[in-house]
């Protein structure tokens, strides 16, 4: 995961205040009896919750929480597979829909879905519970396009037009979670026989590819605190909320047709030393307190119907019709797609 960490003070304060007000609430369901002991949560390195939330879980259940973070989302799943005979912990958070099938197929997860799981969201055959969601989208710098008299792009296809030459920066799908999501979005949009030619067109039109999100967004993009030359960047649907000025106007926006949905899950690890504690923690991640805290702490959207910060509602809604791919298809083809993509670059 490489998520925006810069956000408006009002946004962070409102999310923290809402979470603090809810933190004293009991869990909405699942395992709540105080039993004691420690539950180890294995997670990616972007996991964060406001002060006091994990402490409230301990007060409610008796379980202390220890965190283990082996890396980003891809590294997380790889480490779970490598250590499945001697699990790193009891529960896991941060497996997303691009890796969920692989985690299940490799046998790293026990069968458990929270009784509070949101209806209609994938459970990986009863092994995972959706906790948060978001969209990876192209973002545009409104001010740049207005100042240069160029229409903002609204489709994938426009980006290979000479009018947008040298304007786009994305991240490497082999080294970046959003980069992989964008590659999958192009496969979902153009199909398995059309995406390669689309990427050739992007490359001919001056596409810049960076290794990570931070460089693309803060160095090469013109619409954030960097002074980069490129007004189109691969980022997140939530990013424009962090770019709202004191005047209440968003300096950036999403190209909604390019948005691809990302869902993050929690589950119980097979062979967990404390499976009951793990179940209780999975349930807790769906509590109102945690769900309300997710936007301000992890810059993702909750999966339940808790209120979003006002800036998100106005400037950074989830896409109404995002691109989605079957997790099993991703698991079966990820390596081949990445190899084909690398071959395009020569």
Task: Give the role of each language-model region.
Residues 25-102, 222-225:
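Early extracytoplasmic/lumenal segment of secretory-pathway proteins
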Residues 260, 264, 269-325:
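Mature extracytoplasmic/periplasmic domains
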Residues 184-257:
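Ligand-binding pocket segment of bilobal, Venus flytrap-like solute-binding proteins
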Residues 311-346:
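Extracellular/periplasmic bilobal clamshell ligand-binding domains
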Residues 87-92, 110-140, 157, 166-173:
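A structural signal for short loop-to-beta-strand junctions that line the ligand-binding cleft
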Residues 1-39:
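Short, low-complexity disordered leader/linker segments with a strong preference
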Residues 109-116, 127-130, 157-160, 231, ...:
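Short beta-strand->loop
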Residues 97-107, 123-151, 179-189, 263-267:
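Periplasmic solute-binding protein
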């Amino acid at each position: 995961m490489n998520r925006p960490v810069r956000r408006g003070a009002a946004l962070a304060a409102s999310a923290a205040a809402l979470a603090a007000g809810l933190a004293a609430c009991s869990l909405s369901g699942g395992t709540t009896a105080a039993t004691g002991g420690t539950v180890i949560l294995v997670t990616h390195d972007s996991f964060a919750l406001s002060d006091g939330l994990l402490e409230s879980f301990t007060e409610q259940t008796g379980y202390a929480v220890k965190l283990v973070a082996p890396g980003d989302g891809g590294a997380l799943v790889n480490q779970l597979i490598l250590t499945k005979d001697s699990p790193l912990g009891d529960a896991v958070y941060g497996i997303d829909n691009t890796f969920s099938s692989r985690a299940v197929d490799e046998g790293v997860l026990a069968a458990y879905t929270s009784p509070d799981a949101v209806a209609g969201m994938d459970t990986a055959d009863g092994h995972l519970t959706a906790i948060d969601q978001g969209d990876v989208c192209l973002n545009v710098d409104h001010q740049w396009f207005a100042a240069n008299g160029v229409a903002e792009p609204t489709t994938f296809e426009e980006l290979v037009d000479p009018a947008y030459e040298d304007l786009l920066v994305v991240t490497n799908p082999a080294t970046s979670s959003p980069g992989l999501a964008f590659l999958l979005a192009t496969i979902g949009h153009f199909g398995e026989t059309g995406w390669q030619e689309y990427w050739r067109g992007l490359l001919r039109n001056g596409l810049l590819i960076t290794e990570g999100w931070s460089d693309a967004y803060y160095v090469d993009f013109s619409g954030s605190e960097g002074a980069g030359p490129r007004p189109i960047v691969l980022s997140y649907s939530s990013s424009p909320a962090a770019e709202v000025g004191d005047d209440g106007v968003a300096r950036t926006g999403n190209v909604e047709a390019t948005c691809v949905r990302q869902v993050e899950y929690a589950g119980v690890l097979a062979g967990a030393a404390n499976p009951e504690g793990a179940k209780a923690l999975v349930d807790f991640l769906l509590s109102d307190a945690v769900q309300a805290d997710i936007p301000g702490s992890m810059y993702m959207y909750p999966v339940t119907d808790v209120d979003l910060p006002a800036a998100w509602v106005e400037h950074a809604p989830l896409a109404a019709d995002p691109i989605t791919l079957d997790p099993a298809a991703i698991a079966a083809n990820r390596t081949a797609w990445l190899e084909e993509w690398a071959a395009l670059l020569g």
